[in-house]
């Protein structure tokens, strides 16, 4: 039976779904190779799990679909989904410890959301200027 693992990662309103299966070590994000996806900053953010454990995806093809949110929110959702998939694929507690020691949000969703705007102001906490005379 073919080994396939599905994982997901979330950040703000971005949701990334990753599928890992045996292959040649190709990583695709929204059908685009990771080497040509987005800007350099987003590629570096997504590649963090790969830098921590260099041979983690050798022999694994990773397909990630991400939607919602902004550029960096999507990048952080993708890196969470990728790191979770790598840990599940190898089933190695040492890998999990390396990721948790580096950054907890590699394996745990960052559930912080934007605070909603309130009336009588321009944002969540800021109020319109008041004049007394």
What are these regions (language model features)?
Residues 71-79:
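Beta-rich strand-turn-strand
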Residues 2-9, 16-21, 25-67, 83-133:
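Structured, basic alpha/beta domains of bacterial-type, RNA-associated proteins
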